[in-house]
């Protein structure tokens, strides 16, 4: 298996040279899940970061849960500002996943303590946010700020899903985090669809056994 790509600072350095000083990375977690919210992270990182952890930052999807938690602590402690947006399954079913993801990202930006002057976004364009921005394909693998945002989003969502396990026992949410794993599908077949499941997502839209 090839080594994961190390995200770089090329985008940020280019923007700093143009005069932008408050550059926020944005990414989401939970877009493809069958249960729970979609969560977005926004983060403004300072230049010239130091520490062994900096070289460990990657797209959250290629990191172990333990390493994500470790990096999350360093990222939020060193960030100029960070914000999290959460859009629940009811809103996802009403809006659709793409608009819901954009809404979560908008919330994350609004929760920043300082207003960014440029957004670096993983893949998406955000027309509802009136700020200069750039959507980058595979941005979470290529861009340091977006990779940091991906870790914030993933850890924030995973923690929320672990909390929801107490409210919805028997679904093992802490294990699969709402993704469509074999374990999750077995739980659904035994218990039916819960109030936090996304009813418009296949194969759940054909099930109506709501607890």
Curated annotation (Swiss-Prot):
Its EC number(s): 3.1.26.4
Pfam families in the record: RNase_HII (PF01351)
GO molecular function: manganese ion binding; RNA binding; RNA-DNA hybrid ribonuclease activity
Catalysed reactions, semicolon-separated: Endonucleolytic cleavage to 5'-phosphomonoester
Ranges for domain RNase H type-2: 21-211
Cellular-component GO terms for this entry: cytoplasm; ribonuclease H2 complex
Family listed: Belongs to the RNase HII family.
Protein name: Ribonuclease HII
Species the sequence originates in: Dehalococcoides mccartyi (strain ATCC BAA-2266 / KCTC 15142 / 195)
Gene that this sequence comes from: rnhB
């Amino acid at each position: 298996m090839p080594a994961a790509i190390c995200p770089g600072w090329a985008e940020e350095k280019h923007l700093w040279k143009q005069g932008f000083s408050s550059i926020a990375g944005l990414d989401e977690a939970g877009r493809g899940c069958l249960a729970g919210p979609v969560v977005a992270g926004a983060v403004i990182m300072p230049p010239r970061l130091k520490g062994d952890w900096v070289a460990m930052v990657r797209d959250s999807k290629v990191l172990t849960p333990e390493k994500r938690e470790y990096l999350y602590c360093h990222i939020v402690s060193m960030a100029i500002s960070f914000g999290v947006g959460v859009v629940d399954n009811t809103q996802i079913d009403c809006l659709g996943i793409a608009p819901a993801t954009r809404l979560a990202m908008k919330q994350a930006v609004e929760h920043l303590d300082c207003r960014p002057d440029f957004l670096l976004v993983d893949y998406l364009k955000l027309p509802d946010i009136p700020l200069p921005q750039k959507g980058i394909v595979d941005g979470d693998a290529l861009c340091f700020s977006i990779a940091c945002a991906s870790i914030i989003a993933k850890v924030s969502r995973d923690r929320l899903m672990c909390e929801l396990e107490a409210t919805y026992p028997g679904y093992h949410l802490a294990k699969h985090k709402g993704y469509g794993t074999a374990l999750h599908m077995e739980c659904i077949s035994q218990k039916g669809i819960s109030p936090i499941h996304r009813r418009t997502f296949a194969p759940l839209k054909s099930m109506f056994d709501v607890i």
